[in-house]
Amino acid sequence: MAVYEERIPQVKQQRPRRRGNRKLVFLLVLFFLTILIIVFIRSPYSKVQEIRVTGNDIYTTEQVITESGLMKDMQFLNVWENSVRNNLKPLEAIKDVTVSRSFPGLITLHITEQKRVAFWSGQDGSRYALLDNGYVLKQVNFAKRVVDRPLISSWASPELLPHLAKSLSKLSPNVLAEISDITLTPTVYDKQRITLYMRDGNEVRSVIYKLDKMMNWYPAIMKQLPPDTKGVLSLFEQPWFIPYGAQGAIPIQEGQEQPQQPQQ
């Protein structure tokens, strides 16, 4: 009998299938995941709780937030950068905006604006920013804000403003801050002659197309003059300085110091 039992092939035991268990686990996970999503959507953590704005100078934080279309208590996950960018297009001085999200509920708008290089003074007392692209921004009246840029007055040729803006944008911040007023003083031979009134009491006479190359030398030139000397500095081909009330000019030597570089 033992011999016959050895010849009979033994039937392998089949393992029970687990498809039913896997399907049950999947349904349970899906169920609880759905519950978690519903709970999150209805919780305060799914809402926008705070909106911050950085990089804005021309527009106020309230203006940017209002124009962006963002509001508190809106869905946190329903904030799209392209939508915000399109909403901010009416604010003409904004070059770009990026949106960052920080959990829970914080939205930050990072604003990049055109640079203010001067102020355009209107006849009615209004004051508008001249941007580095040559555009006079009339959306915002700066009449009640601190004058931290040159004030343009007596300017009869608006077509020259883009050229002036380009030159001013290349000046270092320190030199730009020293300029108080700019007037257009053309001659028969040169329509781009300008006069700059400095905050230290001096006058500078130059031309628009040389301003960005010559004006950054201003701090170095002033160091060559006797202390407390005020007068007229001419920045053309060869700079020279005439004190107020004097007949002769003080020679100016170029190249003794490096000009101040514009901020990138």
Swiss-Prot record:
Cited InterPro entries: Cell_div_FtsQ/DivIB_C, DivIB, FtsQ_DivIB, POTRA, POTRA_FtsQ_type
Subcellular localization: Cell membrane
Extracellular topological intervals: 45-264
Gene Ontology CC annotations of this record: cell division site; plasma membrane
Keyword Endoplasmic reticulum: no
Keyword Oxidoreductase set for record: no
Cytoplasmic compartment residues: 1-23
HAMAP family in the cross-refs: DivIB
Protein name: Cell division protein DivIB
Organism: Brevibacillus brevis (strain 47 / JCM 6285 / NBRC 100599)
Gene name, Swiss-Prot/TrEMBL: divIB
